[in-house]
Amino acid sequence: MTMNLIQLLKGKWRFKMIISIWAMTKEGLIGKDNQMPWHIKEEFQHFRRQTLHKTLIMGKNTFFSLPKVFDKRKMYVLSHEKDFKIDHPDVEVIYDYKDLLKEYANNDKKDIYVAGGLYVYQQLIPLSDILIVSIVKGSYEGNKYLSVDFSNFVQYKQPEIYDQFSVYYYKKKDQKNSI
């Protein structure tokens, strides 16, 4: 991604925040064959609480891995296939995340939650203002690993500790707004 796009998105055009939210093991495992390698009810509930009544962006494979379309959320599904369509009132297919970010740029009331998968996280975590990261305890098998450079982020509140995972909250270091 070019620095010009980042400057454009973070400068003149401004939406409230880009928030990336995901669960991973301490090794960075996030998926196995387009599914989550774990089924932790409390972690799913945490995701639901964080994203309810919000706008989400995710990749096509992530969308198809969902048990159903999430209720009470606007969902944008990123696809490189120009003829790909989804017929649902709360779901819109987009072909370039930059267009979506430009559309939301002047909206200072809406956050955009990045909800996976690997490619979408790799593109949008560097643009994110907030990271909400669940670290899942235990060992799991999988084939999708996310490597995140946390050097531009700082933990801004105490982790939430659960039996099977812990949630960490980070904000971008140069963020001027208090959280």
Swiss-Prot record:
One of its GO terms (molecular function) is NADP binding. It comes from the Bacteria. It is an enzyme of class 1 (oxidoreductase). Keywords: NADP, One-carbon metabolism, Oxidoreductase. Residues 17-179 form the DHFR domain. One of its GO terms (biological process) is one-carbon metabolic process. InterPro entries: DHFR, DHFR-like_dom_sf, DHFR_CS, DHFR_dom. Pfam families: DHFR_1 (PF00186). Its EC number is 1.5.1.3. This is Dihydrofolate reductase. It catalyses: (6S)-5,6,7,8-tetrahydrofolate + NADP(+) = 7,8-dihydrofolate + NADPH + H(+).
